[in-house]
Amino acid sequence: MTDLPLLDTDGDPASTRVVVAMSGGVDSSVVAGLYARAGYDVVGVTLQLYDHGEAAHRRGACCAGQDIYDASEVARTLGIPHYVLDYESRFKEEVIDRFAASYASGVTPIPCVDCNRTVKFRDLLATAEELGARYLATGHYVASRALPDGRRGLYRAAEEARDQSYFLYATTAAQLERLRFPLGEMRKADVRALAAEFGLPVADKPDSQDICFVPGGDYAQVVQRLRPEAAEPGDIVHLDGRVLGRHRGVMHYTIGQRKGLGIATPEPLYVIAIDAARQQVRVGPRAALSVSAITIDDVNWLGDIPFTDALARQADVYVKVRSTRPPVPAHLARATDGTPAVHLAVGEEGVAPGQACVLYDDAGAAARLLGGGTIMRAERVAKSVAEVA
């Protein structure tokens, strides 16, 4: 039998209600099974986030029609109540509209962060409270542990390849008190083994891959429908001012992109900046991608001292500027205009406005999440065209 994780709750299980956010996948289904088998008063909730009829033919997308059916079948197997909540309008406003607006303005969004910050945690926690639940549990791969001062902290997952802490940096300290992530200390193989032990019909269901509301990964289709100006063609301009060609619309490009530029040059060129107001995509050599400092906005801080103190002390941190990158050493500071900034010990490439700059206390596999913010601006290591020529 597979070892069971610590469910980390207070009180008698039978009198403790736990709402489990059930996407219809194996991870959240196992979470529901863990709490149900331990004797908790479990209520399964699945969010209808968009017109699932349009997406029902697709595999690999969260909460499409098949996923809602799968979640209900898991709940039936476990003998727990299950509700489907229509969150479509708030999901469109908080996630899809922001996603399209970001691409139209030349920045690269992370819709999963917006969804976790708003629909899944802010709104679903409120719904859990209305249902009389003490906790909301999800199938995210991130660890939540009690801190010495009684608060809770977030840590990278035991299985590094599955770690989702980057996407959960905006989770607030208050939310952490009521959130539980039992899979953070587990490995995926053990989760699937538990699904089989519990007799769950989704034990062999493939993992989701795409952004849930993007058919087949074609995000441009979504953006163009909502913000057609993002598909307007414009100039591809070298950092030295030369116009090298035409682009297909700013929504097709992101910082660090090399493929798909459609221009022939003797040296490889990369997207360095996107000026949506001028409908320009600016390109240059790889050396121009290296960034030494980042300013951030909408900061969520989970550290032990106030964020203002951490800035004043220029606290050492480790940062991830993309979910697939390892944490790198940096320190906090204030930019000349007073906004929070992160100074990198070594230049990082592909730092894109709109993406997340996520802070940790070290670079290890068990690092604690200290928070993060949205990237506003990036200061390149090379200050002039001559330096990268």
From Swiss-Prot:
Keywords, in A-Z order: ATP-binding, Cytoplasm, Disulfide bond, Nucleotide-binding, RNA-binding, Transferase, tRNA processing, tRNA-binding
GO molecular function, one term: ATP binding
EC numbers for this chain: 2.8.1.13
Matches recorded under SUPFAM superfamilies: Adenine nucleotide alpha hydrolases-like
Region of interest called Interaction with tRNA, as start-end residue ranges on this chain: 162-164
GO cellular component term, pick one: cytoplasm
Active-site annotation: 115, 212
Gene3D superfamilies: Adenine nucleotide alpha hydrolases-like domains, HUPs, Translation factors
Site residues (Interaction with tRNA), renumbered to this chain: 140, 355
Gene Ontology biological process terms in this record: tRNA wobble position uridine thiolation
Subcellular location: Cytoplasm
Family membership noted in the UniProt record: Belongs to the MnmA/TRMU family.
Its job: Catalyzes the 2-thiolation of uridine at the wobble position (U34) of tRNA, leading to the formation of s(2)U34.
Annotated NCBIfam families: PRK00143.1 (NF001138), trmU (TIGR00420)
Entry protein name: tRNA-specific 2-thiouridylase MnmA
